[in-house]
Curated annotation (Swiss-Prot):
Protein name: Cytochrome c biogenesis ATP-binding export protein CcmA
Species: Pectobacterium atrosepticum (strain SCRI 1043 / ATCC BAA-672) (Erwinia carotovora subsp. atroseptica)
A cellular-component GO term for this protein: plasma membrane
InterPro entries (UniProt xref): AAA+_ATPase (IPR003593), ABC_transporter-like_ATP-bd (IPR003439), ABC_transporter-like_CS (IPR017871), ABC_transptr_haem_export_CcmA (IPR005895), P-loop_NTPase (IPR027417)
EC number(s) stated in the UniProt entry for this protein: 7.6.2.5
Protein's gene: ccmA
Catalytic activity: heme b(in) + ATP + H2O = heme b(out) + ADP + phosphate + H(+)
Parts of the chain that traverse the membrane: none
Length: 206
C-alpha cells in the first residue's frame, strides 16, 4: 500500500495543495485529476520519491519512503511525461539499458507487444512521437514491480496504442498491482473501478 499523509506542496511561494491524504492499495488504480498547474505532476514526483513534500509523509507498506529508499525503488516503476529514453539508442538498446539482466528476446517481445515489431534496431530519434512513447511503455511488459506511477502515459498514442496500454494496465491491476496516474484522456474501461483524487487550485500562501 502507498500512502500520502498530510502532504503539502509549495511552489514559488504558492501552496498548490495541503493536508492531502489518501491510500492506494493492491489491485487499485488511482487517477490524480485537476486543471493544469494544480500540482498533479508535483504530487506524482513526491509519491515516487523524486521530490520532497514541504511537510507530510509518503509511506510504502507503512514505512516512510525516505527511510527505505533502496527497497522502495525496487518496488516502483516511474514513467514521466517525457519518454525518458535515449534518442541515439535503438528501442532494444534502451530496454537493455533498463533491463540488462533480461535476454534480448524479452526486449524484442516487449517491443512487439507495443506494436514495434520490426523497429527493434531503429534509432529512437528516427521514430515518431507515438513510437517513442511506445518504446518507453514497453518497460511495462518487462517489469514485475507492484507499483506503477505514470504521468500522462496516453500522450501521443493513437487509438490502437491506447487500447494496448489499457489492456496492460487491466492485467496489472487484476494481478494485484497498484497504478497511480494522471491523464487528460477518458479511461472508460476503468470507469467503475478507478478512484479519482481531484486537485483544485489553492489560493493560499505559506
Amino acid at each position: 500500500m502507498l500512502e500520502a499523509r498530510d502532504v503539502v506542496c509549495i511552489r514559488d511561494e504558492h501552496v498548490l495543495f495541503s493536508a492531502l491524504s489518501f491510500t492506494a492499495s493492491s489491485g487499485e488504480m488511482v487517477q490524480i485529476a485537476g486543471a493544469n498547474g494544480v500540482g498533479k505532476t508535483s504530487l506524482l514526483r513526491m509519491l515516487s520519491g523524486l521530490a520532497t513534500p514541504e511537510s507530510g509523509d509518503v509511506c510504502w507498506q507503512g514505512q516512510r519512503i525516505n527511510r527505505i529508499r533502496e527497497h522502495f525503488n525496487q518496488q516502483l516503476l516511474w514513467l514521466g511525461h517525457q519518454p525518458g529514453i535515449k534518442s541515439v539508442l535503438t528501442g532494444e538498446e534502451n530496454l537493455r539499458f533498463f533491463y540488462p539482466q533480461q535476454h534480448q528476446d524479452a526486449h524484442w517481445q516487449a517491443l512487439a507487444a507495443v506494436g514495434l515489431a520490426g523497429y527493434e534496431d531503429v534509432p529512437v530519434a528516427r521514430l515518431s512521437a507515438g513510437q517513442q512513447r511506445r518504446v518507453a511503455l514497453a518497460r511495462l511488459w518487462l517489469t514485475d514491480v507492484p507499483l506503477w506511477i505514470l504521468d500522462e502515459p496516453l500522450t501521443a498514442l493513437d487509438v490502437a496504442g491506447v487500447e494496448m496500454l489499457t489492456q496492460r494496465m487491466e492485467h496489472h491491476i487484476a494481478h494485484g498491482g497498484i497504478i497511480i496516474l494522471t491523464t487528460h484522456q477518458p479511461l472508460r474501461p476503468f470507469a467503475q473501478s478507478i478512484r479519482c483524487i481531484q486537485l483544485t487550485p489553492s489560493e493560499g500562501t505559506p
